A protein has these predicted regions:
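Conserved N-terminal helical subregion
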Residues: 22, 37-39, 66-178
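N-terminal Rossmann-fold NAD(P) dinucleotide-binding loop
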Residues: 31-32
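Proline-glycine-enriched beta-turn/loop adjacent to the NAD(P) cofactor-binding site
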Residues: 28, 52, 173
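Beta1/beta-strand and adjacent pyrophosphate-binding region of the FAD-binding site
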Residues: 19-28
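Conserved N-terminal glycine-rich FAD pyrophosphate-binding loop of Rossmann-like flavoproteins
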Residues: 54-72
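Glycine-rich FAD pyrophosphate-binding loop
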Residues: 39-59
């Protein structure tokens, strides 16, 4: 048994050297999507650093997802998402902002496939779907203040005085990026 424990310890040391550390800055849709993709990879260790201190989203904030985005989301089992929380419209109507008259419509169902359909849903429902298996990897209240790159390592410093080191950095902090 001692031999196997030493062998296992050596294996873990080698594996740890080979395992790449990834820091994902931003716990929104793109950061969470990327983290879900990494969940299927065994040679990456990662954490998600979100500057907000919580995930409180307004329930009524809706988003639209194109067929192409649904194709990507289906890679992380979005096709198993609750049907009663999403809607697949057939067309979009365009109206004049001045007169409210209809200008035209677009039959978006023409772009649908059997597995990928134009979809609308609440942003909060999509975020909850994306973060459901990642809760322990999300660090909230981590606003980045400095990025330093030395000796093929990236050192992150946060406003809360915490530090993190990684091999790769994914910055997906949205439209309010610094």
């Amino acid at each position: 048994i001692g031999f196997y424990l030493r062998l296992q310890r050596k294996y873990l040391i080698v594996l740890n050297k080979l395992m790449k550390k990834i820091a994902i800055i931003g716990g929104g849709i793109s950061g969470l999507y990327f983290a879900n993709i990494l969940n299927h990879q065994k040679n990456f260790e990662y954490k998600i650093f979100e500057k907000k201190d919580n995930y409180n989203f307004l329930e009524g904030y809706g988003i639209q997802l194109s067929v192409n985005s649904i194709k990507l989301l289906n890679q992380i089992e979005f096709n198993k998402f609750q049907n009663d929380k999403k809607f697949n419209p057939d067309k979009i109507n365009f109206h004049s902002i001045k007169s409210s008259e209809k200008i035209c419509d677009l039959n978006i169902s023409d772009f649908n496939t059997k597995d990928c359909k134009y979809t609308t849903l609440k942003r909060s429902d999509l975020v909850n779907f994306l973060k459901k298996d990642l809760e322990s990897l999300i660090k909230t209240n981590y606003n980045i203040s400095n990025i330093d790159h030395k000796n093929q390592k990236i050192k992150l410093t946060f406003e809360n005085k915490e530090n993190a080191e990684c091999d790769h950095l994914i910055i997906s902090d949205g439209i309010f990026s610094k």
